[in-house]
């Protein structure tokens, strides 16, 4: 599916860029751009989206709390690890989408995990120059996640960790 979507995006881009304006009417450009944006969104879902149903299939039960995040890597030149952060049985587990060949057997895999008890504190704010999220602190270590939903409503992170929501916290 990803290959087909890539080819369609490339073909549509080539049509818009390389077909002379005399042969391509203006009214056709807007639907072409709209369908290209739709194809890019479809490609993103095919590459990164992990549904709650996929997580239930792999873990064998529904997670207590879950939300879609991007985990920042330790190496700044690497890409985000995108997936669904789940809290189940006292563990934080980041489930990442598997490749197409493996998807029928296991739609997602565990990319990162940690015990909830190890979290010493939580911080909210900008984790990248253009992205908000939250930071989980483990003593001297920290793990950063991008998640606009969690940055806006901090209670979901506190509830997921099983902590009381502070009165001074914004977004209650």
For each predicted feature, which ranges?
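Anionic N-terminal interaction surfaces
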Residues: 1-6, 13-16, 25-90
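Eukaryotic phosphoinositide-binding membrane-targeting regions
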Residues: 43, 65-76, 151-168
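Disordered regulatory linkers adjacent to lipid/PI-binding modules
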Residues: 171-172
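Phosphoinositide-binding peripheral membrane targeting modules
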Residues: 75-84, 88-134
């Amino acid at each position: 599916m990803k290959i087909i979507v890539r080819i369609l995006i490339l073909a549509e881009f080539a049509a818009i860029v390389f077909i002379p304006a005399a042969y391509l009417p203006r009214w056709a450009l807007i639907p072409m751009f709209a369908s290209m944006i739709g194809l890019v969104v479809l490609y993103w879902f095919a590459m990164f989206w992990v549904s709650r149903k996929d997580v239930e299939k792999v873990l064998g039960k529904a997670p207590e709390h879950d939300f879609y995040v991007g985990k920042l890597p330790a190496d700044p030149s690497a890409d985000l690890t995108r997936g669904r952060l789940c809290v189940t049985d006292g563990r934080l587990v980041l489930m990442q989408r598997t490749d197409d060949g493996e998807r029928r057997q296991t739609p997602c895999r565990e990319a990162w995990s940690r015990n909830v008890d190890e979290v010493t504190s939580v911080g909210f704010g900008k984790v990248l120059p253009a992205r908000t999220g939250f930071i989980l602190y483990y003593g001297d270590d920290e793990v950063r996640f991008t998640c606009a939903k969690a940055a806006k409503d901090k209670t979901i992170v506190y509830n997921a960790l099983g902590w009381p929501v502070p009165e001074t916290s914004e977004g209650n």
